[in-house]
Amino acid sequence: MQSWPRRTSCRRNMDYADWELTINGTNLHWPEVTIDVLFTKAGKPFIVSAHWPGQTGLHTAMRFGGWSFQQNTRFHSLTTDVLYALLRHSDGFQFRSRRIMETTPDFETAVQKMYNTDMMAPQYFIMAGAKPYQGAVLSMDRGGRHLPGTPPLMRLGNASAGKRLGTSWYLVQTNDDMFEQPRDHRRPDQELRLSTATQSMVSTEWMWKEMLGLALYMEDTVFTSVYVPATGYHETLAHPGQFR
């Protein structure tokens, strides 16, 4: 996620393996069943979302003129997640994110609603708005808590992000906590690449080059999405050659 001089953009690689569906003797994997869904309201584009079969909530989406959203896995216990859902009535993120995106037009209100939600599982939410430096990474704990060891709400341009990254116009969130030891090479490699870049380089073409580069593109990358809420730019590229 990065801020342009006049807008903010968000991009993601969805990495997800170990699934296939056989239809008429043909094995289909995640990339072959990834589609771009356009929701309309009063005949006008409202929300765009990267979707999979049977999906009714949102994991990668943008509200036109408003804000974008993506969810990243934060490693956790599935058994505990189920217990929180059953006993505490904590929310699953897909339905909650759809409700908020449908009813909340502005970025700041959406960030606060997401951050204060009682979620059943730890995870990361990456959100970008239509204005410059409207970008945030929400490191979520289950049960509506914000634990001492969990990174605070990180924003583009804030001091805590700049202190760690040496800059304020971008944030990199993969599947591990900021300021902690990375679980894989993606975050440190991409931060190293960005340390040699300048904000004036940012464009949709530049974002695609970064997302498909060696630092972020993995063997199990299912699709890549780029969203710019201010302009309505959106594109999702599935990678059907993966998992073969």
Model-derived regions: residue spans:
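C-terminus-biased signal that marks the final domain/tail of proteins
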Residues: 1, 95, 101-244
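A contiguous strand-loop segment
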Residues: 1-92, 120-122, 222
